[in-house]
């Protein structure tokens, strides 16, 4: 059984509330996803810190169990913003799973910040980034269909 306690800072709580995302529902859904992804009889407990940053990107820090969600988006309405923040969260949650459940070393994500900002093939075709984009699409759509 995998249990993740999500520790949202006050700014990210405010951000998610502004687009009608219930953080308790999001935490329960997070635990559901991770237990479906990696079935185990062991008890694994993690604390995952999620904070808001003033930018248009998000990030996960391998080895630190820390997600940063950017608050800047060009999306105009609440539904588009909600989808944007959720997809960013699920993308970074995939990196959390890669780090903690799959034991992927950060060095396997062998691209630079420049590669990521340019979205070139080093970044875009990296198998761990491909998987994270798949999580974005799959879990964002499922979450929205369940809760909205």
PLM-predicted stretches and their roles:
Residues 91, 95:
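Histidine-centered divalent metal-coordination motifs
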Residues 6-17, 118-148:
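Long, well-structured alpha-helical subdomains associated
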Residues 83, 87, 99-130:
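Post-HEXXH active-site segment of zinc metalloproteases
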Residues 35-44, 103-105, 143-148:
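Surface-exposed helix-capping loop/turn segments at secondary-structure junctions
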Residues 51-55, 73-75, 90, 103-104, ...:
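Short, solvent-exposed loop/turn segments at secondary-structure junctions
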